[in-house]
From Swiss-Prot:
It is an enzyme of class 2 (transferase). Belongs to the methyltransferase superfamily. L-isoaspartyl/D-aspartyl protein methyltransferase family. It catalyses: [protein]-L-isoaspartate + S-adenosyl-L-methionine = [protein]-L-isoaspartate alpha-methyl ester + S-adenosyl-L-homocysteine. This is Protein-L-isoaspartate O-methyltransferase. Catalyzes the methyl esterification of L-isoaspartyl residues in peptides and proteins that result from spontaneous decomposition of normal L-aspartyl and L-asparaginyl residues. It plays a role in the repair and/or degradation of damaged proteins.
Amino acid sequence: MTEKKRFPLSLSSIAEKAPRSGARTEVNRSSTSGKVATPQTATQNASQHGKRTITPARPAEVPRKAAAAPSSNERATPLVSEAVRKAMTARVAKQGVKDSKVLAAMDAVPRHLFMEPALASQAYIDASLPIGYHQTISQPYIVARMIEVMRNNQQGGVLNRVLEIGTGCGYQAAVLSLVAKEVYSIERIKGLHELAKANLRPMRVANIRLHYGDGMLGLPQAAPFDGIILAAAGLEVPQALLEQMTIGGRLVAPVGERHQVLQLIERVSKFEWKSSTLEDCHFVPLRPGTVT
C-alpha cells in the first residue's frame, strides 16, 4: 500500500524531481479579461465562501513520497482530511496553475494549522482569512500563482535563495520551502513574526529563516535572491528589493492602491529590469517600519 504524503516532507522529495517539459510555463504578460483574484479582504471572503461545500477531486499529477506520521491535530477532525486538501489543489489547478512542483507543495502543506481553530472549517476554500493584526492569509490560488510565476525562470525553475516580504502566519513560507533551497522571510509586525515561528517550529522546516524587520528594506545581508515575493501591495516596488535580485531573478508583487495588479519584474542586467502585468488582485497595503 502506498503511504500518503504529509508535511513536512524532506526538500528532496519535491525539489528537483518533478518532470518538466522543455517549454517554460506560459506566463500571461497582459491583464486577463475580467479575471480578478479573490480580494485579500477577510470579512468579505468569509461571508462569500464560508458555506461552500468542497467536493474532493483529483488534482493534477504531483510527485508522491513516503510520509511522516500524521499529527494528532490532523487526526482529530475530518475537516482537514487529505481529500479536502486535494480538492483545494485540484481547484487551484483548474484555475490555471500548471507547475507540478507548486501543486505538490500546496497539496503537502496543511493550511489549517496556520490559522485559528475556529476557522479550520474554512481553511481549504479559495479565500483569504484573518490571522490577526488586521492581516490575512492569502487565498490558495494567489499563493500558487505567484510562486509558479517566480519559478518560471531561465534556470528551469531552480530557486536557490528566495525572499518573502510579509511572513504573516508562515503558510506561504512553508509552501516556498518545498520549491526553494533557502527561504528568507521578513515580517514587520512582531506578533505575527512570533506566530509564524510558533506555527513552523513543530514542523521542523530546516530551510526557512524568519526575520523581524522592515520588509521594504529587504535583507541585504542575505542577498542576492533568485526570487522575491511580496504579500502586500505598494504603489511601486521598493528600489532596495530590486537591487537585491540576482541577474535573471524574478520578483512577483501586487502593485497599486484601490486598483491593484500582480506584477512580474525580471532583472535583465546590473542596471536594467523589465516588468509585465499579469492579472488583477487585491492585497493588504505594504507599509514601512515595524510594529512591536
